[in-house]
From Swiss-Prot:
One cellular component (GO) term of this entry: plasma membrane
Biological-process GO terms, alphabetical: CDP-diacylglycerol biosynthetic process
PROSITE patterns reported in the protein's UniProt record: CDS
Membrane topology classification: Multi-pass membrane protein
Major localisation: membrane
Native source organism of the sequence: Staphylococcus aureus (strain COL)
Protein's name according to its UniProt entry: Phosphatidate cytidylyltransferase
Keyword hit for Cytoplasm: no
Higher taxonomy: Bacteria, Bacillati, Bacillota, Bacilli, Bacillales
Length: 260
């Protein structure tokens, strides 16, 4: 517990100023986190980060995470790069004489999209305003807290025991309920320019998909037989273990709230 608490304090001291600063500093930080998360995901499938498919995936990830506001050329480069990456990793299945399989190639492409889109929207959301990223973080944290407390006090029915044995239906519902505190509290300080009932609905959707994001990452770990995605955060696991919910929450927040 001491190690876990110390790690959380150090992470907060490093993370909070970068989040408040935003801009280029946050973009670089998000890219570093994304590369670590990609390495964790590839390692689950026994794909070395320093290898042909690993390095191609890393390049694809960096391109996916180019800032969208830089201009229309960004999306053109992203599309062409993903096409090129697909051809390269598929060709490598032949060049490696099937030591690198078609399933591995598909996994690399999926990993780049999964990690890249999630972390790209990390700094894109912050660029729209500090209140949006705080809104996302508070939803995830209160959902997790509510799910834990309700599950501890009332949990009797397992949610998905094959993937995550400790999660319960009661905890899942409790997490949704607790997430509603966020918009009700933030509306006193921030004008979201949205009807309160619509904002509550968006919050429930984000809370729901945040919990699904957690289950997806748990599914990865269960499938590949690992306890944590990594060991970079003592007591907490890896980067993916800490940001799994945000892989779903941040893109959806942009679609439902910012770009609507």
């Amino acid at each position: 517990m001491k190690v876990r608490t110390l790690t959380a304090i150090i992470a907060l001291i490093v993370f909070l100023p970068i989040l408040l600063k935003g801009g280029l500093v946050l973009m670089i930080f998000a890219n570093i986190l994304a590369l670590i998360a990609l390495k964790e995901l590839l390692n689950m499938n026994m794909i070395k980060f320093v290898s042909v498919p690993g390095l191609i995936s890393a390049v694809g990830l960096i391109i996916i995470m180019l800032p969208q506001h830089a201009g229309p050329w960004v999306q053109v480069i992203q599309l062409k790069s993903l096409i090129a990456m697909s051809f390269i990793v598929l060709s490598y299945t032949v060049l490696s004489k099937n030591r690198f399989s078609f399933m591995d190639a598909a996994f690399c492409l999926m990993s780049v999209a999964y990690v890249g889109i999630g972390f790209m929207f990390f700094y894109e959301t912050r660029s729209e305003g500090l209140h949006y990223i705080l809104y996302a973080f508070l939803i995830v944290w209160l959902t997790d807290t509510g799910a834990y407390l309700f599950g501890k006090m009332m949990g009797k029915h397992k949610l998905w025991p094959v993937i995550s044995p400790n999660k319960t239906i009661e905890g899942f519902i409790g997490g949704l309920f607790c997430s509603l505190i966020v918009p009700l509290a933030m509306l006193y300080f921030v004008d979201f320019n949205m009807n309160v009932w619509i904002l509550l609905g968006v919050t429930l959707i984000l809370s729901l998909f945040g919990q699904l994001g957690d289950l997806v990452e748990s599914g990865f770990k269960r499938h590949f037989g690992v306890k944590d995605s990594g060991r970079i955060l003592p007591g907490h696991g890896g980067i993916l273990d800490r940001f799994d919910s945000f892989m779903f929450v941040l893109p959806l927040l942009n679609i439902l709230l910012i770009q609507s």
